[in-house]
């Protein structure tokens, strides 16, 4: 990274930390510094009222560029465009398609379809649901289906049928048997069967470089009352468990890792939420 210059600040006298502290104490007029100005976070550390350059000495990752380890600024190197996504529950295929087309006209470029968990969707069903929705332009995500393998096969076959350019297809299936075990106390089918499904999903997704098939849903932990640290710990542990179990089944880490998608809960505590996403990128890297 280029070294920062101070050309704009040459006329301003540097202010020592001790001078800041002296001024703060004066303005407090005897009030307790710790109680008034120090934020005691639920994550177990105290946030000071201000920070200075010396506080970030040694934090080399702050100088990293997007696309470089440890990826705290993401992996995109040409732009930083984010998908704008809207979720919708699919009760009726035609009505869901109409709603999807309507919101796409309003600027949405990512769709999250929450499917009937018990229904096995055919290629014809997906044709109705995704009519006039172009997978090379719109990110298409499926949530909730217990028949993830059949869904993936049918979606992939439809992409082939319509000659979609696989390198431009973005989306996800979000199959999460560990999440199912955590929230429901049981697997979709069985431990062995669900992990075998994960493996087969990854094998199909090998043709779709921007389509992820395994979802780690940190929102489950967030909504159960986990702190930021706990949500990160539980989510990353689930990710590591998928890596461990699936590499034991013959897949390489390079097969598995790119196919895992993490979702985290976001609250009104924005600074901590931003820190959580950056920390997740760093720890997973």
At which residue positions do the language-model features occur?
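Catalytic alpha/beta active-site cores
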Residues: 1-269, 273
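Extended amphipathic alpha-helical segments enriched in small hydrophobics
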Residues: 273-285
């Amino acid at each position: 990274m280029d070294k920062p210059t101070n050309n704009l600040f040459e006329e301003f006298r540097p202010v020592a930390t001790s001078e800041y502290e002296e001024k703060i104490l004066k303005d407090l007029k005897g009030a307790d510094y710790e109680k008034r100005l120090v934020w005691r976070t639920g994550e177990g550390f105290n946030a000071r009222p201000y920070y200075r350059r010396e506080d970030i000495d040694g934090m080399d990752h702050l100088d990293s560029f997007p696309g470089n380890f440890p990826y705290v600024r993401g992996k995109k190197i040409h732009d930083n465009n984010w998908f704008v996504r809207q979720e919708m529950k699919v009760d009726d295929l035609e009505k869901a398609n109409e709603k999807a087309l309507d919101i796409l006209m309003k600027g949405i470029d990512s769709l999250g379809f929450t499917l009937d968990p018990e229904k096995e969707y055919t290629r014809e069903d997906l044709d109705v649901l995704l009519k006039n929705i172009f997978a090379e332009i719109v990110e298409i995500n499926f949530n909730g289906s217990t028949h993830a393998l059949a869904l993936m096969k049918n979606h992939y076959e439809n992409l082939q049928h319509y000659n979609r350019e696989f390198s431009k297809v973005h989306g996800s299936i979000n199959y999460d048997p560990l999440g199912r075990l955590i929230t429901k106390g049981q697997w979709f089918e069985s431990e062995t069967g669900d992990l075998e499904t994960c493996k087969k999903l990854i094998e199909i997704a090998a043709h779709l470089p921007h389509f992820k098939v395994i979802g780690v849903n940190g929102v489950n932990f967030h909504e159960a009352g986990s702190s930021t640290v706990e949500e990160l710990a539980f989510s990353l542990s689930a990710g590591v468990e998928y890596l461990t179990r699936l590499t034991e089944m013959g897949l390489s880490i390079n097969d598995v890792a790119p196919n895992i998608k993490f979702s985290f809960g976001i609250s009104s505590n924005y600074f901590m939420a931003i820190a959580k996403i950056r920390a997740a990128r760093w720890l997973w890297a």
